[in-house]
Amino acid sequence: MSCGSPQVMMTLWTLTCVGLILLGAIRLSLGLDYDLESFDYLMEDNPEEFDYKDPCKAAAYWGDIALDEDDLKWIFKNKSNDLRNTRHNQTHPTTDNFSEKLGTGSQNETSSNLNSKKVKKGSRLKLLIAEKAATETNSTFQVQTSNDRVRRAATSRTERIWPGGIIPYAIAGNFTGTQRAIFKQAMRHWKKHTCVTFVERTDEESFIVFTYRPCGCCSYVGRRGGGPQAISIGKNCDKFGIVVHELGHVVGFWHEHTRPDRDEHVSIIRENIQPGQEYNFLKMEPGEVSSLGETYDFDSIMHYARNTFSRGVFLDTILPRRIDTSVRPTIGQRIRLSQGDIAQAKKLYKCPACGETLQDSSGNFSAPGYPSGYPSYTHCIWRISVTPGEKIILNFTTMDLFKSRLCWYDYIEIRDGYWRKAALLGRLCGDKLPDPIISSDSKLWIEFRSSSNILGKGFFAAYEAICGGDIKKDSGQIQSPNYPDDYRPAKECIWKITVSEGFLVGLSFQAFEIERHDNCAYDYLEVRDGFSEDHALIGRFCGYEKPEDIKSTSNKLWIKFASDGSINKAGFSANFFKEMDECSRPDNGGCSQRCVNTLGSYKCVCEPGFELTADKKSCEAACGGFITQLNGTITSPGWPKEYPTNKNCVWQVVAPAQYRISLQFEVFELEGNDVCKYDYLEIRSGLSSESKLHGKFCGPEKPEVITSQGNTVRIEFKSDNTVSKKGFKANFFSDKDECSKDNGGCQHDCVNTFGSYICQCKNGFILHENGHDCKEAGCEQKLLNAEGTISSPNWPEKYPSRKECTWDISVTAGHRVKLVFTDFEIEQHQECAYDHLELYDGPNGKAAILGRFCGSKEPSPVVASTNNMFLRFYSDASVQRKGFQAKYSPECGGRLKAEIQTNDIYSHAQFGDNNYPVQSNCEWVIVAEDGYGVELIFQTFEIEEESDCGYDYMEVYDGYDSTAPRLGRYCGSGPPEEMYSAGDSIMIRFHTDDTINKKGFHGQYTSTKFQDALHMRRK
């Protein structure tokens, strides 16, 4: 595979890798598989021109191990050397795959023969890997002994450490709000447990960018410097644990299993490694790493799992060695930082031994030893970090420090930001309590130092986050309290934003998830065009859809967030900035007709019947027009001749209110195929170019009849400057739409039918008894109908995150539930560990499981063994898909269990409502426990009568199948009395032909103790 075509080779839990810290050279962590054949671009003449900021273009780009800068220089330095000089004669079990892939000959091959072969670009890169692999001993069965202290690799080059532990970041715009929340949760996790700080990038030269590169899941290890560097979160990598792992590489960690001493702790089973992935298991040299005094960490979040890059899910590639005689340690967790990870990061960044990161909305801290007295030469740092848009109130309730001039010896410094270079809010000592200190933003830095021998009791301080407030700056961010975690109940926050005079306020949402309600009655975000609650309402928002970008009409914007005391969601994150209305300029933005302002820009548009010229500002007469007729015909320019090139025609068709417009094509022939890249016809409901799109059409195939959603249609035709075709001819006509007025009285969807209409509810809601309103169906449904359809929440749209839904399906007694899937698309995972659908063979989740499903392949039909089936659907916090739809129905027959209590059996699922169906063949086996027999009695019996019961009939056998003695064949009014089995089972067979059908039968069965008189009475 090339850099442009990554492929996930293992399931996410096999992408686990845990960690060492980078040694001086740039190294890259990936969780993907790439073919060595595709690195031709590494053989260019100027290595200095490579973009190391993009992991895909760096030399370090292979799987989970990579080359460093020195390796890359080695490649170019030796580019013209004889391939035979690269240890071609060296053989080793671990290099067989490389030799075979490289096409290397035997050891006796001459240099001239080798040189006569055409050397493919990139082959030297492969030989470098082979050379490194060849230096290792086979660690599957051998253990290296060493008296050296256990190494845990850490960078020895200070330029790879982020100065002050500050890592600026930016997030690319193509990520969803849920993904952004996961990134921030992962960064908060690192901040909470170490002294590393992630801050949104402002003007910093070096920073990381969350992006989606072709390398999939990858990152540089440590700070690259000199500009942005990518941390790629590719497909299926947007999980909390995986992002924490990738951030570990950014901080400076490398993979644990590549340590020089790894063979003392794990065995590498090379024969189980996927071909081409052997380089992921190479060891680092002892000279490449320095020790931080930390032992090998099986629990590290940077460690590979046992089957990473395995030929099969159940084959180990890394096997932990047993500690003493105990069980093997678990490796590959992706839940949280281990204690070893935390300890090593603190050593790498020289974190103070005293202090912590405080992220709760309120809390307290105190000097070490308080109130008994702090020790001399103490250094502590506390970092308070709350949600953007909140401020921090800091109160000192006790203060007793050695007092000196200018607080030179013992002191507390409070800074208005995330580090020691932030603005100083106060330097405190002595015993005088300061006034409450309020931050200007969402972070405070508190540093305590003692250097005197005269000690005091210390201090005690408490803080609280307050949301809302006046914000006077040209750009910034606001978030719901506690974002990206769920917001807190009973909160009210009001922000009053003011930007510079002469500008407007722009508001753009990155994430939005607030408790849903039709009228946003419970939790909501309210935005007003001004500086108070009395100004014009722009919108009140809730639910899961991000609001459109918002723009004020002045330099002020009022925002209110409110939550009630019950359901809490992830909340929102939004950026605000100053915005200019270019269309308000005297020259109308340079547009000859209409100027439309957009956030951050503007565009020129033309009136109907005109089109933009090449300068995108002027308008000229065009084909198309404004049509108000109820019926008519529209044709391409020049019809019936070929249409001209370089045409752009727009027709706007308007019918009276409560009418819909249908468009039917007689002829259609445009250049192109299904891509519609050159000439095309675009049809929308509405009059603007951003209205709902019905379709974009080209080629020779006529579109189906298209009906508008309202009383307007926009038809746009475009041709390029080359091929012309015959064009199109279409007839339009109008029909009254009852749904267009007040939505037909329907709360959700009104569906117009010919001469009438019906109301429908969105998925997750059910229609009220009044036929118009909708009520929430909830996610726990008990289904008692004989048959029906179920679907995931919001189907066919993407299901919501963090959802758990259950369905308890119960069909007619004596029948089995059959489930057939008609649509299926759930996040893929080899073990369905994330989003999944579970089916159980009974009325609840304690029954035997029938299967756990995910992915995009429709499962085969599933049949329960009884008349109950239980379904549970679960979605996690990240990837969402379309979901599923399935139909359930009763399947006659099956194996039934006779118990002491009476159970029912019916001839068909619609018994009592409809006669039994024709051409049916059903078999039931009723089984009792050992020592018990089966008693069968019929309450109702009505089957087509015939003297020999040759048409429709019921047969009863004294055993498990038709080889057992037959107790009788019955039709008409059925058996005259109850029946008893001689053993522990009875089989019932019901057959109908293709003609007359009757009411059917209703039987009851129980288990009884064997009594000879009863059980032999049938004889």
UniProtKB/Swiss-Prot annotation:
Domain CUB: 354-466, 467-579, 623-735, 779-891, 892-1008
Proregion positions: 32-152
Enzyme class: hydrolase
Residues at which Zn(2+) binds: H245, H249, H255
Signal sequence extent: 1-31
Region (Disordered): 83-116
GO cellular component, one term: extracellular region
Cofactor(s) needed for function: Zn(2+)
Cofactor detail note: Binds 1 zinc ion per subunit.
Gene Ontology biological process terms in this record: cell differentiation; proteolysis
Polar residues composition-biased segments: 104-116
PROSITE patterns: ASTACIN, CUB, EGF_2, EGF_3, EGF_CA, ZINC_PROTEASE
An MF annotation (GO) of this entry: calcium ion binding
Gene3D superfamilies linked: Collagenase (Catalytic Domain), Laminin, Spermadhesin, CUB domain
Sequence ranges assigned to domain Peptidase M12A in this UniProt record: 153-352
The name this protein goes by in its record: Tolloid-like protein 2
Native source species: Xenopus laevis (African clawed frog)
